[in-house]
UniProtKB/Swiss-Prot annotation:
Pfam families: MP (PF01107). It comes from the Viruses. GO terms for cellular component: host cell plasmodesma. Transports viral genome to neighboring plant cells directly through plasmosdesmata, without any budding. The movement protein allows efficient cell to cell propagation, by bypassing the host cell wall barrier. Acts by forming tubules structures that increase the size exclusion limit (SEL) of plasmodesmata, thereby allowing viral ribonucleocapsids to spread directly to neighboring cells. Keywords: Coiled coil, Host cell junction, Transport, Viral movement protein. Residues 292-322 form a coiled coil. This is Movement protein. The keyword Transport applies. It comes from Figwort mosaic virus (strain DxS) (FMV). One of its GO terms (biological process) is transport of virus in host, cell to cell. It is found in: Host cell junction, Host plasmodesma.
């Protein structure tokens, strides 16, 4: 008589406005944490305001109605995702990239949100990406590695750089953190290319094809919102390296451009009969949710696996300023 053991574990749990979800199989481990802003301090919306009464001369009753009509609640879902995967030696030459955030992952998140709120969510705010490389060979081998996180939607290679690092796996590990600090529409055609991780391992002769040379583990902090103006970022730097890794590696920030001087040419095309940019809610409806992405719930499995992700919530305080 023999018994079989499942090689894949998947579970999810919703507690009020908090949701955790994980998956583990022979290819690696992934976990997600989503928290609605009602579970955190309310983030005030500032910086974009027009006082209607300063534009229109309105009776007091109409002023009140106008303000009521234009009240808008910030819908914010803070998310932390972590994934781990082994990399084959054949994929370390810098010719492939790893997408760190995908539309499929976002679809999975949106399926857990109440439909009345989900229909409003239109933006993703990218807060932080922490990347850890762990060697799958003994310590003491000189193994230089180059890494870059790029926004591959941007055509110019220099402009696409979010952060780069050079390190060595002689001590077994290397880690750095990039802070993108920008938002984009969920309708962006190439959203999957926004956070593209590229790596180049110098010792391509260390192993043969089929052997796994190192493990990539990454942690992403982001927020799903209904507005581009919902989030303020805490970090001032664009990239950081842990103090312990500074002796064996270095980092490079994305360069800030020299602003071109304003010229005297104000010529632009203001002719009539231009095409209108489409507005309205129809664009959001185009973001189709795949119902097949819903998974079965099993609270017993959650209890046995929750220890692997119980610290993810604490990561939020390192990414967003909730003061």
């Amino acid at each position: 008589m023999c018994s079989t053991r499942k090689t894949s574990v998947m579970d999810e749990k919703v507690i009020e406005n908090e949701e955790i979800h994980f998956q583990e199989n022979s290819n690696g481990f992934s976990a997600d944490l989503t928290i609605h802003q009602d579970k955190l301090k309310q983030i005030s919306k500032t910086g974009l305001n027009l006082e209607k009464e300063h534009i229109f001369n309105m009776p007091s009753s109409l002023t009140k109605a106008f303000k009521t009509a234009f009240k808008r609640k910030n819908e914010i879902f803070y998310c932390v995702s972590t994934k781990e995967m082994s990399v084959d030696i054949k994929d370390v030459s810098g010719q492939v990239y790893l997408p760190l955030i995908t539309k499929q992952e976002i679809q999975q998140k949106l399926m857990k949100i109440d439909p009345s709120v989900r229909s409003k969510i239109s933006m993703i705010h990218l807060g932080a990406v922490k990347i850890l490389l762990t060697a799958q060979f003994r310590q003491g081998i000189d193994t230089s590695v180059k890494m870059a996180l790029i926004d591959d939607r941007i055509v110019n290679r220099k402009d696409s750089l979010l952060g780069a690092a050079r390190g060595n796996l002689a001590y077994g590990k290397f880690m750095f953190t990039v802070y993108p600090k920008f938002a984009l529409s969920l309708q962006s055609k190439n959203l999957d290319k926004t956070l593209s991780f590229i790596h180049q391992f110098e010792r391509k002769d260390l192993m043969k094809t089929g052997d796994k040379v190192f493990t990539v583990t990454y942690l992403i902090g982001y927020a799903l919102t209904n507005s581009h103006h919902s989030i303020e970022y805490r970090k001032n730097s664009n990239i950081e390296i842990e103090e312990v890794f500074k002796d064996i590696g270095q980092i490079e920030e994305s360069p800030f451009c020299d602003i071109s001087p304003i010229d005297e040419n104000w010529t632009m095309d203001i002719a009539r009969n231009k095409k209108s940019i489409a507005t309205g809610s129809s664009s959001r409806r185009n973001f189709r949710i795949d119902e097949s992405l819903l998974e079965n719930k099993d609270e017993n499995l959650l209890r046995s696996m929750s220890t692997k992700i119980d610290t993810l919530g604490k990561k939020l305080s390192l990414i967003y300023d909730n003061e």
